[in-house]
Amino acid sequence: MTLDKLDFQTDYLSLDSEFYDMTEPTPLDDAYLISFNPHAAKLIDLESSSGDDPRFVDLLNGTFRPEGVRPFSMCYAGHQFGHYAPRLGDGRAINLGSINGWHLQTKGGGETLYARMSDGRAAIPSSIREYLMSEAMHHLGIPTTRALGVIGSQTKILRNDIEKAAIVMRMSPSWVRFGTFEYFYYTKQHDKLEALTDYAIVESYPHLKDDEDRYFKFFSEVVERTAKLIAQWQSIGFCHGVMNTDNMSIAGLTIDYGPFSMLDDFDFGFVCNKTDKAGRYSYGEQPNISYWNLTMFSKALSPLIDQNRMQKKLDDYGSFLYPNAYIDVMRKKLGLEMKLDEDAELITELVGALQDAYVDYTNFFRTLSRYDGERMPLYDIAMNPVAIHNWL
């Protein structure tokens, strides 16, 4: 369909007004198209030629509103670096509504009521990074938000230097976060907490909506999806950088691409966020932080679900859900055709060898994929080839 035929739904606005605030975007000056994503456009039945339509830039810039668009920003709280922040929300994200189950949201469209002294803008480099990385993650088979397009402008913003502002259009099956539940738990609005849970089930786990035990099963599936997601992150060397509970998706998606990075030399202690001085969100800590975040999520759900039942599910995360998910994806990465009891030991020894070898993570697997018995190509890419030799 063409841009003028888009018809947005805003089911989230059926919730109480404390869940959101209506927001008016602030258009950029002299906005222009940087990139349009025809692959993401197919998800909402938008014609691939829409990137050539000037109204696409206007859509992202907030000056063109198709049928049903009602801009709003979502309210949530969250634990940031382990400390509870009682009111966060979409500081620079503006939701337009949903099409075909995909919620469209602009990032960088101006100040919202949650901006917290920021300008509500996004710089061109960081916007392009998110646009490219979210699409790369999708094509690597990792659950993620998508990006429909990105625009630049002549609007100047102050970061470390003066930069030009951009807006990226993000798409997600859900923008509900762990921190959304925390907000209503800590403000003791348990009726709204229940309404949010019902909404999240219909949105992301519709097969549970008529189940008598739907709240516990909802929590269980969030734990399972999160375990699989983090295992996939670890398998490709993805480091998120800001794993606060407000950046954790209840749908098991990679969301909020900020100071993310990919591993170069394999290093469990790698930290991609310069503000993370203690290494809380280092590459090697991501599985543990996910468990901690799920524990905070379980606390937020405790008015609805027995805490002991949730704790047993959390114990499963550490004992077999995450370890098994990680072994499964690494088994595929190594091209192992059969599941053997020895696989876990083989993979554990491999990552230990990579840590000791000072070797580029991605390059190691590219080289290993061409392994024909000749070891020198693998030795040549390691600063400490003895570690690779001992594993082989």
Which residues make up each language-model segment?
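Short, contiguous strand/loop micro-motifs
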Residues: 24-26, 119-121, 216-217
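Conserved ATP-binding subdomain of kinase catalytic cores across diverse folds
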Residues: 30-33, 38-51, 56, 61-210, ...
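ATP-dependent phospho-/nucleotidyl transfer catalytic cores
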Residues: 127, 156-240, 250-340
